[in-house]
């Protein structure tokens, strides 16, 4: 019976975090808080290019998985709540195949080098924009 209980606990912990890259990992940052602004440009060949304007945040791809520094890391790009890739610079291309709804939501959130979401005033720092097809 003890083993069954252990397996059930492991199963529910796994299923509860199956859609999370790193479940429950957030870190509160101090002021001035990082800010994100998104510009979107239709690509002449396929999809869209987004420009991620950052304030009080530095992209540091060379530091991934090292000791985190406040307000440094990367941006995680989502389309319709599905994470599609990391951005280590201000430009990111999203192919047309990700835009399968009439109204599509692009969300950009920032993470530190240990993959923790950055939080200001108990809210994950992110920005969203709607793309209509």
Model-found features: residue ranges?
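Short, compositionally biased P/S/T/A/G/V-rich stretches that sit at domain boundaries
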Residues: 20-43
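Contiguous beta-strand segments within globular domains
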Residues: 41-56
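Short, well-structured beta-strand segments within conserved domains
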Residues: 48-52, 99-112
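Short amphipathic, basic-aromatic surface patches that mediate peripheral association
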Residues: 53-67
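Short strand-turn-strand beta-turns centered on an Asx-Gly dipeptide
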Residues: 77-81
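Short beta-strand segments within Ig-like beta-sandwich modules, predominantly Fibronectin type-III
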Residues: 83-89
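Short acidic/polar inter-strand loop motif in beta-rich domains
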Residues: 85, 111-119
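Exposed aromatic-hydrophobic patches
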Residues: 91-98
